[in-house]
């Protein structure tokens, strides 16, 4: 079994300091949280950025400030900007961090109803366009899937040459409007991807650590962080993203699965630094 890649989604676009006062907004806070996760064992930093007041932004300039500062604090980390941004952003806004030529970026592979009137729109043409710019800028996509139909979309587009292979998937589980976070559903998703593909599991809230354990024992990789869950255990806010990563490292040790370094993660993901 491959070594375990741990991704830290350190702030997201929706979670706020009201949910957990340690959620980072400023560049300094974002770097602090990235370093806490990196030092704990995360090799990938999944990155959203905020204005100082917490407003989500896809500003290329703001991303550059954060990326440069994270690289200085965590020189070997794989920084993976989000192209999901926040609900309601334009395609042009969402694409901005791709033009910084990061090693990886997220590629959302379908539309999802997030609840109420919130629709996270990702049409087929949008996915093709985003992937085109990733290929042009040498960016490895992480195919974000919220249900099985999005895997089918990614496979279909890959067969047409729109998405490079082998693909790496992120199974986003337990989101309103998406697939549930259960062992049965994870096994179903794993059986739906091409055999040469790799996958990470991102489960929301209380599901984060049970599904992390499932990912570890099924040969997948794990994402944790404030974007997906702000608690270290029931009713106890996490002190940092690093604390969440440390818990995954302990789980991996119990199951006898070594944690990948950033250089080992690059080899697994097929990324050339």
From Swiss-Prot:
It is an enzyme of class 2 (transferase). Belongs to the BKACE family. Kce subfamily. (5S)-5-amino-3-oxohexanoate binds at residues 14, 82, 85, 106. Homotetramer. Zn(2+) binds at residues 46, 48, 227. GO terms for biological process: L-lysine catabolic process to acetate. Its EC number is 2.3.1.247. Pathway: Amino-acid degradation; L-lysine degradation via acetate pathway. Pfam families: BKACE. It catalyses: (5S)-5-amino-3-oxohexanoate + acetyl-CoA = (3S)-3-aminobutanoyl-CoA + acetoacetate. Keywords: Metal-binding, Transferase, Zinc. It comes from the Bacteria. InterPro entries: Aldolase_TIM, BKACE. The keyword Transferase applies. It comes from Acetoanaerobium sticklandii (strain ATCC 12662 / DSM 519 / JCM 1433 / CCUG 9281 / NCIMB 10654 / HF) (Clostridium sticklandii). Its cofactor is Zn(2+). GO terms for molecular function: 3-keto-5-aminohexanoate cleavage activity; metal ion binding. This is 3-keto-5-aminohexanoate cleavage enzyme. Involved in the anaerobic fermentation of lysine. Catalyzes the reversible reaction between 3-keto-5-aminohexanoate (KAH) and acetyl-CoA to form 3-aminobutyryl-CoA and acetoacetate. The reaction involves the deprotonation of KAH, the nucleophilic addition onto acetyl-CoA and the intramolecular transfer of the CoA moiety.
